[in-house]
Structures are given as structure tokens and as C-alpha cells.
């Protein structure tokens, strides 16, 4: 004898299949979503670059104007001591320079662009410091973190030496990156926290006038 399902059991079975089917997502959809999510995450990975351009208040402010730069922090690098703070660096006890660490989106701005931008916001002819600030801690330097950055920096420097709009020699060195020590909170975004004092200092130091004298409209 052939057994048949009762109407109630049949209805329950159909309902159960419907619930299961409604919660099934095709594998292709999951894969596509995962690939899209991975692509978005890869675009958001930031790179970092380190530059010393005299007073870190100023070079921090300059780099934060550049599209693709997500964050700039002030700090100290290039020295021999295993620690650094404003007092010891200013009194030249550690060999460090005032510097900035730039976090940037390479899909928006390239390392080569950062290097070119750096050159045009410093005085690369000054071997005593930068602008009104003199002393070892205010010397300029470009720090590379890997072979690719080194090649880009060397290529940029070579081109600059051929095309520079001034006669003086370029003395800013290209150096392998060392440990970067974050500066005190007081110095971070100083130009935003103390705009009047910062503006007075920057104008008084002659930074913008000297940059304009060297580079004209090449910024």
C-alpha cells in the first residue's frame, strides 16, 4: 500500500523547505562580496614616509595640506640615542633631528609626489639648519625606508640638481630611516592649537619668503 502524507504534515514540510531556501545565499554572491570587501580594504592601507625640514610645526602644517595625506605627526629621528624628547634634542644631546612622519594613501598621492613636495617646502641649500632655526636638530634630511623609496629619492635628487632654479648646491642628505620617536603632545598640530603664535613665528622666521625666493611658483 502506498502511504501518503497527511495535509498537516505536507504543509509543515513545505513551510520548512521555504524557510531553509530563504536563508541560503549563493556562493558566488559571497565570493563577490568578499572580493569587493578585500579590494576596498587594500585601497585603505596607508604608507608612511619620514622627512626632516627644520621646525616640525611648519613642515607638519605644509604636508597636511596635500591631498592624499591622512595624518602627519611631529617627532625626532636620525640620532644615536635610544630615546628622544624636545629638551635633549634641542640641546643636541641625542643627535636627532626634528622630523615628521607622514601617513598617506598611495592610491591618491605617490611617494615620488611627497618627495617633490618636500623639496619645494624647505631650503635644501642650508647646511646650518632651516631658515631662522640653526643647529643640528634643525637640519633637513630625507629618510627612505626601503630600496624602492631610496631609488625614488635618488632619482628626484638627481633631477633636481639638473633643473634647480637656483645656483647654490643642494646639501640635504638622503638617509636610511631610523627609529622615529613621537614628539610631545604640545607639539602635535601646533599650528591648529596656537594659530596666532604659530603665524607670528612662521612669518618672523622668514620661511615662506625664503621658499618663494628659491622656488618661485614651483610648489
Q: Language-model segments: which ranges?
A:
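Flexible coil/turn and secondary-structure edge motifs
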Residues: 2-6, 11, 16-219
